[in-house]
Amino acid sequence: MSNIIFKKGNIFSSDKQTIVNTINCVGVMGKGVALGFRLRYPEMYEKYKEFCKNKQITIGKLWLYKRPQEDSKWVLNFPTKFHWKYPSKMEYLEAGLQKFVETYQEKGITSIAFPLLGTHNGGLDKIDVLNIMHFYLDKCSIPIEIYEYDPKAPDELYKQFKDKWMSMSIYDKKNLGIRTNQIVVIDKIINDINNSSMASLSECNGIGIITLQKCFNLILNYKEQPMLDWK
């Protein structure tokens, strides 16, 4: 029986010990799942920008980020492209997958959730990527999930945010530094029954990165003292 399970949904809902964040080598996390990681792990994002500035993020080099809290997930940052403007390449995926297979045990990774590498914003074919991921990951002896990105999949963080936001007065919302017109937009999103994830906020016109971070800060504790582990 295969140790790999394919899912379509929200990778942040995974119960696996480690989740994979696909990154470029120039310090940008501006779209899709990467933006979700940026907002959930702002300390990691700041370190990532610093590492990119110092040319420490390269293809085939994996960066394992750990929060000190025992119940926090680890994040494996996996470069799938050099620049965010350019497409991913299969050889980039293979370099990272080979490194993962060689090092996951010594790094203490006991279960992991991958996205379909390089397919959402990287432009690679889903079937080709799934085949190459199976080729390498079938060699591992740990539970593995592979997620196809679905921005509409339910997100527990969204429910927490919605409950918190709806309990706040307009005065409290303004005290967060969110402008009145942005509050109106967020209220509209919150009241739309078709929205069920934080991605619905990030994809809405009129809501910028700074406002998104303020929304995430409502429900996340960012007092991090991260441990960094290079592969």
Per-segment meaning from a language model:
Residues 1-231:
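Macrodomain-like recognition of ADP-ribose-binding/processing modules
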